[in-house]
């Protein structure tokens, strides 16, 4: 059921690992701030009925979260966004339509909460997605593509994710794409009887850092190839065994690419970093893990190189998270309750400023009449304080029942009719007692850290 028009109309479009192939997700992926800003600006320019917008782009999903103007048809916005994506990413509308999942209103809120709580992830319970959503929100907020509506939504999503983590055991086992990749590499080493536990890691972003930490926990020596030596120096300060990690500039890739049996690649590059022209034949078999989207490794021409992509790891992920069903069920209960609580909170935000406005109107009216009475000497000046207290108590008593009724009805869909009628009766339509000055109330946890 669609909520009445005084509430924000939330809307999501999602392309995920469940509905779209890796090859297609590569085309949608956005890996730079400049590209993301340009894409959001295109939406703002060509979709005037979208009030606020943000984009979440990860290796397993590309999602658009938006709030729509009142009386806007969601299907029209869906078609407009798919058209923008088709033109921007040089993809066919029919391919996009087959893979897209659209949600509106409560379903959209439930979807955002589920994604943020890692219930929709390839690795259920992984915590990386919450940080990715915070970064996506922060960017859209700072670039002024989102404001009150999405701030409220994301604030609640982060609270929901924290509650899921704290009240279930869904994140305790620490399974992630990076941990599954390293575990598979370890299995390969045992089967291949490779004794020299050395690995080459290309990249130093969040995914690469997680891989490195998992490798070190399994007693590997790691050579990192990257572009930023200062970032490497900061990173090794976090490590318990920094001596097992070394760094070389990625310009030296040719010197190392054929020397390691084990390679992990996870960068934000939109192009292949490891290319066939760099490869030479080796006497040993090689096992490469490409954890990037778009992929960083060109399909090898040599038969003794075995390449694993993110999607290739999915069966191993399912095997590792099979015993989380009970936690997952509990987590969905929390998300369902959070969705209800979110709408109750949103509806109460419409009522609270109205209650404040009514009380302020009563106070001003009482004070105005008291000053008239004092001026005309109907009452002595020395009684002013006592009369103010009497009037204050009187209008509090008068407004007590309406206040209770407003708060009670705030959780009902017809509350907008009641709110609108009261605003009209008391000429409060132009009141600004809440929204702008209280925007900080709706800011997400990111800004509270």
From Swiss-Prot:
Pathway: Porphyrin-containing compound metabolism; protoporphyrin-IX biosynthesis; 5-aminolevulinate from L-glutamyl-tRNA(Glu): step 1/2. Keywords: NADP, Oxidoreductase, Porphyrin biosynthesis. InterPro entries: 4pyrrol_synth_GluRdtase, 4pyrrol_synth_GluRdtase_dimer, 4pyrrol_synth_GluRdtase_N, GluRdtase_CS, GluRdtase_dimer_dom_sf, GluRdtase_N_sf, NAD(P)-bd_dom_sf, Shikm_DH/Glu-tRNA_Rdtase. It holds the Pfam family GlutR_N. Its EC number is 1.2.1.70. During catalysis, the active site Cys acts as a nucleophile attacking the alpha-carbonyl group of tRNA-bound glutamate with the formation of a thioester intermediate between enzyme and glutamate, and the concomitant release of tRNA(Glu). The thioester intermediate is finally reduced by direct hydride transfer from NADPH, to form the product GSA. CDD domains: NAD_bind_Glutamyl_tRNA_reduct. This is Glutamyl-tRNA reductase. Belongs to the glutamyl-tRNA reductase family.
């Amino acid at each position: 059921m669609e909520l009445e028009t005084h509430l924000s109309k939330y809307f999501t479009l999602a392309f995920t690992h469940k509905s779209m192939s890796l090859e297609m997700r590569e085309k949608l992926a956005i890996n730079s701030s400049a590209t993301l800003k340009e894409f959001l600006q295109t939406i703002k320019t060509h979709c005037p009925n979208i009030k606020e917008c943000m984009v979440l782009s990860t290796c397993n999903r590309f999602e658009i979260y938006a709030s729509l103007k009142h009386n806007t048809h969601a299907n029209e916005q869906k078609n407009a966004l798919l058209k923008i994506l088709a033109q921007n990413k040089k993809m066919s509308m029919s391919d996009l339509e087959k893979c897209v999942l659209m949600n509106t209103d409560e379903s959209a809120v439930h979807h955002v909460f589920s994604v943020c709580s890692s219930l929709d992830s390839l690795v259920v319970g992984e915590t990386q997605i919450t940080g990715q959503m915070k970064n996506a929100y922060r960017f859209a907020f700072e670039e002024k593509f989102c404001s009150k509506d999405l701030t409220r939504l994301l604030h609640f999503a982060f609270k929901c994710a924290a509650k899921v983590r704290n009240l279930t055991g869904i994140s305790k086992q620490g399974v992630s794409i990076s941990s599954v990749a390293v575990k598979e590499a370890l299995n390969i080493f045992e089967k291949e009887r490779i004794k020299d536990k050395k690995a080459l890691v290309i990249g130093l972003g969040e995914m690469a850092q997680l891989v490195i930490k998992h490798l070190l926990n399994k007693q590997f020596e790691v050579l990192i190839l990257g572009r930023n030596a200062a970032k490497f120096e900061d990173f090794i300060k976090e490590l318990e065994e920094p001596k097992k990690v070394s760094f070389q500039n990625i310009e030296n890739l040719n010197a190392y690419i054929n020397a390691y049996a084990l390679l992990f690649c996870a960068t934000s590059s939109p192009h292949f970093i490891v290319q066939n022209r760099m490869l030479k034949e080796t006497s040993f078999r090689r096992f490469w893990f490409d954890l990037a989207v778009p992929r960083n490794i060109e399909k090898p021409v040599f038969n003794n190189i075995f390449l694993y992509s993110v999607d290739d790891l999915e069966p191993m992920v399912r095997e590792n998270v099979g015993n989380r069903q009970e936690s997952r069920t509990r987590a969905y209960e929390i998300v369902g309750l959070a969705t209800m609580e979110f709408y109750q909170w949103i509806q109460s935000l419409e009522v609270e400023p109205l209650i404040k406005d009514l009380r302020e109107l009563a106070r001003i009216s009482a004070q105005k009449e008291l000053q008239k009475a004092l001026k005309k000497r109907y009452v002595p000046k020395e009684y002013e304080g006592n009369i103010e207290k009497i009037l204050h108590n009187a209008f509090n008593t008068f407004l007590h029942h309406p206040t209770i009724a407003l708060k009670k009805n705030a959780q009902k869909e017809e509350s907008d009719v009641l709110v609108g009628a009261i605003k009209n009766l008391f000429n409060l339509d132009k009141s600004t007692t809440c929204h702008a000055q209280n925007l900080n109330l709706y800011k997400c946890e990111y800004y509270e850290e």
